[in-house]
Amino acid sequence: MNTKYIDLINQTFDFPQEEFLLDKDYLRFHDIDLNKLVETYGAPLKFTYLPKISDNINKSKVWFENAIKKHSYNGNYNYCYCTKSSHFKHVLNEALKNDIHIETSSAFDIDIIETLKEEGKINDDTFVISNGFKRAQYITNIARLINNGHQNCIPIIDNYEEIDLLSNEIYGNYNIGIRIASEEDPKFEFYTSRLGIGYKNILPFYNKQIKGNPKVELKMLHFFINTGIRD
């Protein structure tokens, strides 16, 4: 089992990365002199290079477009920006330039969604994938969003209690997804694929809570895979 910080870095990043360049012992990022930034603002320093956000979103879209054509796949690819990666307004505004949808992870993310709707930056056609463990306020906020007409808000069911909790607060019918626990073999102590409904319990869970439930319709299966699937 690898437990050192360098193991986490090696697990998360591939080196070298094209964004970085060493120029006479000074590090540049997208041709930005990082030494000058540190001299100006001090260190530690965190900044966001906005053009790369759109570049990566569109790169992902091209990958999927090519794969869909290659395999004659009949479905569509919808890119969802995960708010927990950054809640900063300037980051969200850059991402939203690219015809995307949104994934939320907590109660205040729904407040952000409602603000974006008020500003006209998203609308009822925007998919809002509500992921994560749902405490009481998160349940209430999701229900409020759906009750106010955002039928494209799809809560991802993370455990056996969430359907009942949501149904108690959502007035009409609504769509759901199921988070499937990948149950991959943990190769690191930094293991994050533990949440969701286990493979063996999917059908019993569906038959018991979804199949005969007139309020909910299953629209999505959600997998979180950290280092890949082994068949």
Residue ranges of each PLM-predicted region?
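Active-site-proximal beta-alpha loop/turn segments in soluble metabolic enzymes
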Residues: 181-194, 220-231
